[in-house]
Amino acid sequence: MSQQKLSIQLNCPLPKLDFDVITLGHGSGGVLTHRLLDTGVFNVLKNDLLNEQHDGAILNFSGPVAFTTDSYVVTPIFFPGGNIGELAVNGSINDLAMCGAIPEYLSLSFILEEGLRMEEFWEVLLGIKKASEEAGVSIVTGDTKVVDKGKGDKVFIN
């Protein structure tokens, strides 16, 4: 009997990093999360405090401080005159203004649904940038989570 030598090569492929949609991996805290934040959030909303990439922000104030939180869950996420990103920024700024405060800083958290088109996420980010620049506020911290398809409504913002 003749023996045949089998040549098997095992290769570990590089992970896929370019996606057309949000995947569960984008919320895992790993490579995909960091890529989404670096190319998306940090790149679009860049400022010195956000660029520190901490889970919080350290701010110095000499007088009273007003703060608020609000969550935005709207369908559709794009509507005549804006999108959920602009609504979230302007709504939070309005809440602070109703306290008599002059808004300077905001936090920003996303709950993204698996399958959200990356193009839609970018459009929401650009709406956030536009609204925050118009109001003169900086996004200084935030969080991003991804939920299974069918467990959210594209994007929730706090």
For the regions a language model picked out, list residue spans one by one.
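Glycine-rich phosphate/pyrophosphate-binding loop regions near the starts of catalytic domains
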Residues: T23, V31-N158
